[in-house]
């Protein structure tokens, strides 16, 4: 009975707050002469703060047009903006900037949804050793990470040198599908020097950029490495979940002035690999069995950073040269 009453009170409070919010929006429109979309665009700076407010306003609207606008095809965005302006009785000649601002926001919102679909498609595609394209990507990964060491054969214990678990890497891609391979190859190709350094450090953590004095100060005398490729696939899983949960909206809405793309996602992966590598060394785990603890602590730190509406996980290395800050 108590549970039922608690649920009833929560439902009543929800509808009461919703009613009050609609009343407040009505009063604000009468006082300012502007609808909620206008107030957001005129009073909030471009980036995640504005786009996320616009997204919430559209999604929670009573209008079917506004509700569905967040999932239209990119080619239909311009017409959708015209329809919204007409619905809200806003003259585009008097308010030319509003249409431009709304279009920028919708490009980001729709682009984020499409990015999830693109990433999900790669995640669901299994690695196929009979597919020449898949095999070529895998062999390129080796060449980028070990340019001076030829791979003796496709099935080889050498794969363990770059962090795979066995002599055939295809079994390690089961969890993240081709997405894991795409990310690893992107990191190794676009930021070869950094990727090779991270690989070297993962094998020999004491040979990293920390000086001997810093090692002693941080008491990292027992520092251990990790499996580069396996951790890369695991960080791919982290990036994927941040994307699907919406946590990465803050980042993408701040760095992509239009629709975020797969390249933006891969650049984010590169950033996470850099940051996790530093975090792992700083945490100085006793053994590899502490990986899940360190990863969870790292995940919480990233999520906390992304709760800041001004946050952008902008890496300062070669792979990030294509990023555009707003």
From Swiss-Prot:
Coiled coil (residue ranges): none
Pfam families assigned: ELMO_CED12
Keywords: GTPase activation
Name this protein carries in UniProt: ELMO domain-containing protein 1
Domain of life: Eukaryota
Ranges for domain ELMO: 133-306
InterPro entries: ELMO_dom, ELMO_domain-containing
Entry GO MF terms: GTPase activator activity
Transmembrane segments: none
PROSITE patterns on file: ELMO
Gene encoding the protein: ELMOD1
Described purpose of this protein according to its UniProt entry: Acts as a GTPase-activating protein (GAP) toward guanine nucleotide exchange factors like ARL2, ARL3, ARF1 and ARF6, but not for GTPases outside the Arf family.
């Amino acid at each position: 009975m108590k549970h039922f009453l608690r649920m009833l009170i929560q439902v009543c409070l929800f509808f009461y707050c919703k009613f009050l919010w609609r009343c407040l929006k009505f009063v604000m429109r009468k006082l300012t002469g502007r609808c909620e979309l206008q107030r957001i665009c005129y009073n909030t700076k471009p980036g995640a703060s504005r786009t996320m407010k616009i997204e919430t306003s559209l999604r929670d609207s009573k209008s079917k047009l506004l509700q569905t606008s967040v999932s239209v095809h990119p080619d239909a965005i311009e017409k959708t903006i015209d329809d919204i302006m007409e619905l809200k009785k806003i003259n585009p000649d008097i308010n030319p900037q509003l249409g431009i601002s709304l279009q920028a926001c919708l490009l980001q919102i729709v682009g984020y949804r499409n990015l999830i679909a693109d990433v999900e498609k790669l995640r669901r595609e299994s690695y196929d050793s009979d597919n020449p394209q898949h095999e070529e990507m895998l062999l390129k990964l080796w060449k980028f990470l070990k340019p001076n060491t030829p791979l003796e054969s496709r099935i080889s214990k050498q794969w363990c040198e770059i962090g795979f678990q066995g002599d055939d890497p295809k079994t390690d891609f089961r969890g993240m599908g081709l997405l894991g391979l795409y990310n690893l190859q992107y990191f190794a190709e676009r930021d070869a020097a950094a990727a090779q350094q991270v690989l070297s450090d993962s094998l020999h953590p004491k040979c990293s950029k920390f000086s001997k004095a810093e090692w002693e100060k941080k008491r990292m005398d027992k520092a251990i490495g990790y499996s580069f490729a396996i951790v890369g696939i695991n960080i791919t899983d982290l990036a994927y979940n941040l994307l699907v949960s919406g946590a990465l909206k803050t980042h993408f809405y701040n760095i992509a002035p239009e629709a975020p793309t797969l390249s933006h996602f891969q650049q984010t992966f590169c950033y996470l690999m850099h940051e996790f590598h530093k975090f792992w060394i700083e945490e100085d785990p006793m053994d590899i069995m502490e990986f899940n603890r360190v990863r969870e602590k790292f995940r919480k730190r990233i999520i906390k950073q992304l709760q800041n509406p001004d946050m952008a996980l902008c890496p300062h290395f070669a792979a990030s040269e294509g990023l555009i800050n707003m």
